[in-house]
């Protein structure tokens, strides 16, 4: 259904039917997991506040960052007319940012704590996505590289923080089940992110035509980045519900 929504000619009734079927199946699966004695996926860890927050809001964040490597090459090649080598070289800056910040992530968690770090860095993630929406064919290469590098830094910090906090307060006996549930949700979020990116491009096409902005290079992709930034912002709402000392058993170690 999500894939159909992102096509040029979405089939209304088929899409609605698939969404309805998926919703009913999902609710039935939840009911089954809660009732059966030995479910394939146990939901016991959902009673842990930190795990629940990272699963709900964290999934929206993972979906939004998963859309970035899909949107950027398309914007550079289809929207701006770059060749594949040029576009791919620019996108590498995101992954350089991912790698170079890794050694500093743990000290940042211990310094700020999980809640403060996820809120501050989450806001920076939103700004980085909005900055991608401001990129034009005339933007200097060094500015594009800086924006993408910083975006990679922020997404890496957020991803590591969420993944660490998820298991910080989960009791030992539930750890295996929690890991299965978290891994499943992560993979679903990655697929959802790509679908949301395609839908965002489609919405960007419609909005750009409605506002008579179709002559602006890459406008549909740039508007898609705005939509993804909003999704990332919504994912931060759950973080506000965290206790001030959430995950302190992990973040306070070796201080």
Predicted regions and their residues:
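C-terminal membrane-cytosol helix-exit motif in multi-pass small-molecule transporters
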Residues: 1-4, 21-36, 235-243
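Short, intrinsically disordered terminal tails adjacent to the first/last structured region
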Residues: 252-255
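Phenylalanine-glycine-rich, low-complexity intrinsically disordered regions
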Residues: 1-15
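12-transmembrane solute porter fold
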Residues: 11-13, 18, 38-207, 216-246
